[in-house]
């Protein structure tokens, strides 16, 4: 019984360590956004919409999800849709969190 607990403890520690290491890095992901949105998020992408700077993480996440599924955005949304649909929810949340702190 003691041996099983030791093995389970080791497995749990490894699992938590791996998931922490695999956590999405919003700052690293945002680097692909800098060209249109600016390093500090204050740039109006393609001259339309709002700058990401100053927006709340939950709103940014909703917008990213909307771009990914095509339910959000204006006439130029195809650019964002094609970029964002490759990201997981975890990555979009990490980006939204990072952008909300710009």
UniProtKB/Swiss-Prot annotation:
Coiled-coil stretches, from where to where? none
Q: Which GO terms describe its molecular function?
A: electron transfer activity; heme binding; iron ion binding
Where along the chain is heme c bound? 33, 36-37, 80
Name the UniProt key words of this record, in alphabetical order: Electron transport, Heme, Iron, Metal-binding, Periplasm, Signal, Transport
User: In which broad location class does this protein mainly occur, judging by the first location in its UniProt entry?
Assistant: periplasm
InterPro entries registered for this protein in UniProt: Cyt_c-like_dom (IPR009056), Cyt_c-like_dom_sf (IPR036909), Cyt_C_IC (IPR008168)
Q: How is it modified after translation?
A: Binds 1 heme c group covalently per subunit.
User: Where is the secretion signal located?
Assistant: 1-23
Locations listed in the record: Periplasm
What is the role of this chain? Answer: Natural electron acceptor for a formate dehydrogenase.
Q: What is this protein called?
A: Cytochrome c-553
* Native organism: Nitratidesulfovibrio vulgaris (strain DSM 19637 / Miyazaki F) (Desulfovibrio vulgaris)
